[in-house]
Amino acid sequence: NLIFLIFAHIAHSQPLFEGEGEREDWLGTYYKGKKMGFTKSKTRWSPEGIVMDSTVFFKIRSKSIDQSTIIKHTTRLSPDLKLSSFSLLQEISGHRQQVEGKMEGNELHYRTKSLGYDKEKTVKFTEQTVPSSTFLINLVSDGLKVGQRGELRLFMEPLQLMVDLEYKILRQETLQYEGKSIDTFVIRQRFSGMETMIWVSHDGTVYRESTNMGFESFKERPQVAQKIDEAMTLSSVITMSLVKPNKPVPRPKNTYDLVYRIHPVSSPEAIPEDHRQKIIKVEKQEDGNYITTLRIKSESKKIDRTVQKKDETEQDPKYLEETAEVQSRHKMIQALARELSADGKSKWQLAKDINLWVHLNLKKEMVDTVTALDALLEKRGECQSHTYLFTALTRASGIPTRIINGLVYSKEYEGFLYHAWPEVFVGEWKAMDPTFGQDRVDATHIKLTENSNESPFHLMEFVGKIAISWSEP
């Protein structure tokens, strides 16, 4: 769903505004050629400003379970096209999150509410900061010209994150729409490893959009946009994002030491290193990308008590922080954490006990339970649900924990799947996997990001683009 959320807020049809008026636009959304959803945008404008209401819908299911996602978003702009306020309601598999924000001076004050979470935060805006839902208005209002390029600071409302967006108007291109020739500008956008192309007309209407991950949208009539013959299944999404290696990995859960070649990689620093994962070689290619060779070992069995690790990262307060997804201060999470830590055990033993509890008490189902509290209440979920609940319980117990996103080998699919797992600091960082019940992750766990503000976007750099080969050391 992260990928879908990002794509849903890249662009909408956005007209130029004169006097007063309103209009409605529809886009049909496809993933690798298969219809999966639509976007409806209704824009109203007057001398007092602009109001845009949008609805994004993705029809998804996992076996017989409805996993559909709907996002309703209202953005208000002042007459000079600056953000005034916004409201956002996301419903993913029946789970709701609401975000409301209002500008005061150069600061956005926003409030995020979901089950077991209600918190206000503030973020500063600069002259270059625009909301992701309406940023095309800012581009089109100044006029479009081939060769024009620039940068914008983009606030992603669904994730409450700031990212830097680079854009360039590449060319003009004529498209056919309902038997008519439409002149468009082709705009390339890049942010955090993700690249999109948008075909937009002089009046700001988006006729086509595509990403380097296989998503596409096309302007359609309402009845066409809403016609979705069959729900996109999570298994089909998994299959399409699967990374097939050069050969199957035998006994992956008992794999302790492997060497990988991964390409294309955008920079020598794109893949992180840690105590398990070391980069051996980085080779620059003619296209400017890199081949990264790295050696990955399974997590060690024991804590190294003979050497005190010099690692100040465990002191970062974000590793004990409560978030909208990890409600570590909720009374139900706190009560379970106290129950699991009742025997006065060591932090490492407590982390292992929490790992086992989450593994045994959550059914392994491909349903997105969105938050730690959802996972605890429903007792089911996929890797992200397991990781969120584990992280909430360890943070509630005072154990610094970070969330890792990367790849892991699946014997069932004979390839690498995108996966989430936690790392805990218990004198040193240790990687665990509550989904698989591993106190020490195996060598097929390839870390691509760890929880920093932009880590979800950094993961987009790899999805649908990389190839992997492996060998023994």
Q: What is each of the regions a protein language model found here?
A:
Residues 201, 213, 217-231, 312-313, ...:
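Active-site rim recognition segments
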Residues 30, 339-424, 428, 440-443, ...:
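Active-site neighborhood of thiol-dependent amide/isopeptide-bond enzymes
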Residues 114-135, 354:
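Acidic/charged, solvent-exposed loop-and-adjacent secondary-structure segments enriched in E/D, K/R, S/T
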Residues 4-13:
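Hydrophobic h-region of N-terminal signal peptides that target proteins for export
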Residues 14-122, 141-305, 456-460, 467-473:
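Acidic, serine/threonine-rich low-complexity disordered tracts
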Residues 132-137, 300-302, 306-381, 452-457, ...:
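Secondary-structure boundary elements
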Residues 171-173, 185-186, 194-197, 280-281, ...:
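Generic recognition of flexible, low-complexity loop/linker segments
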